[in-house]
Amino acid sequence: MSPVNKNYPPRARKKLVKRKVHNKELSDHFDWIRDNNWQEVLHSPSVLKKNIRKYIDEENRWTNKKLSFLKPIEKDIFREIKKKIKEEDTSIPQKDGNWFYYSETKRNKEYSILRRYKSYSSRKKSCIYHDWNKESKPYKYFKPGGAFNSNNHSLLAWSFDSKGSEFYEIKVKDLNNKKQLKDSIKNTDGRIVWSLNNEGFYYIKMDKNHRPSSLYFHLLGTHQDEDIEIYNEKDSGYFLNISETLSKKYLVLNIHNHETSEVRIINQEEKNKKLKLITKRKKSIEYSIEHDQENSRLLILTNKDNAIDFKLMETNENKLSKKNWTDFLPYREGTLITNFSCLAQYIIVQELENGLPRIVVINKKNNKKNIIKFDEEIYDLDFNEGYEYESNKIKIYYSSMATPLLTYDYKLKDQKKRIIKKQQIPTGHNEKNYNLKRVYAISHDGEKIPISIIKRKDTPKNAPTLLYGYGSYGISISPSFSVSRLSLIDRGMVYAIAHIRGGMEKGKKWYENGKKKNKLNSFKDFITCAEFLKKENISKNITIHGGSAGGLLIGASLNISPDTFHCAVAEVPFVDVLNTIL
């Protein structure tokens, strides 16, 4: 495994392994690099086989040596980015019952501090109820999970990963006396839902393959071994997650893969913990639910009836069968519904149309709609309904590739918004110094591929460019603000996002046409975008960047068209696809 020439990277030794899959013989010379006990490695990296560790260390040493000349500028850029981040900051307080909750970051503190104050008091009288920095001290590695206050606001369940394995442990704290309870729940996905009576909580347990596979209930004061298993998913291709309706009446168990879903609910107002099925899973049919308490109905977001970009349906909460579902917000092709929420008086719907997001507010009394839009050519938009079902306002989060995050308070009745927080850049920032642009490249089959571009107004033509792409799992890449990106753009680079097929920027068809047998479209779209930027004299010397499934995109693009690109960054690339899946 030693390099033949010190100017070349270490060469992994070859050891042929053959196996048959679907009557085809597959050959792999590097099978030995994949440790068979990877589940143990996730829990404890030190058990990685010595020959694999040796090769990884050799690669890292060679890389560090070759890139050592970049250390000075790396340090400069790190300091530069750090100066642009406001080290001491606070989030917007969110009301939950008789309390307001918020977080703060402090200088030289790695993690946030969680604070709260009584609703009739003021922020000046707030108290710390959870300090992630304090909790991290006993561990060499620490990653915060979530913090979930009980319905009576007396208890806090919090989760963390102390090994880097993404198996989260859950602990419980008494918020009245600040003492930790003995409860300790291991191997979870990090999220919980409290029971209404605060006597315990629901959680998802991960199996040895890191799959969230089982729903449990934990009664406070008992050992994890005594926890009740409520549901176990036998199909290894499906995953579980839990949430609760904003009304808090129902715990929601979502069972899903990347294209099919099934929902089961528990009525939290009843003593038994019996799961009730909404409708059985059916291949390629997805749905999710919310509860409308005033109208005793469930609202259902689904792609049923060939509504590939989704529609909103409704059914009486006591008549769950699919035959009782009726359209509430009918299907409109080309308008993708990405999210929705139900409050006491309003339904909030988030949509994506022509690659741009918008928020639609529906008055439940008369079904009148109000559309919230913004004026920039490209931007990112999101909303948060808060913790309270009875709320008459929402938070709106807006940013663009040039505009730092703006938080709006939006009054649903008055249809008025006001800025309540602006993301501060301590070194200063003027969005007017930048040009934003949405352009379209024509791919091999005539499809128009959107490209979001930002550059300084004084950047000349044919500038060096970083082109980013992902194009997998239906994930849309938002043209949002990034502090670190400024260090490239302010040095004269163009930054571009290729919204290729495999994402969902132009609806569900956009996703379907970039997966499985259509996956080649993702790669061709990406190469087309790079060629377009050169042809239009926007770019020269294009560096491409993608991570995980986006790393597959980078690897494939380099192999198909190596001369198109100047440099490539494949971050944790998922490039051994068939071996992994098969």
Residue ranges and their predicted role:
Residues 1-393, 399-405, 409-413, 430, ...:
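Beta-propeller folds
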Residues 563-575:
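A conserved short beta-strand
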Residues 189, 286, 539, 564-566:
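Core-facing hydrophobic residues within beta-strands of well-ordered domains
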Residues 133-147, 159-165, 179-181, 396, ...:
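Cap/lid segment of the alpha/beta-hydrolase catalytic domain
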Residues 551:
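Residues forming the Rossmann-fold NAD(P)(H) cofactor-binding site
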Residues 171, 496, 569:
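Conserved Rossmann-like nucleotide-binding pocket used by diverse enzymes
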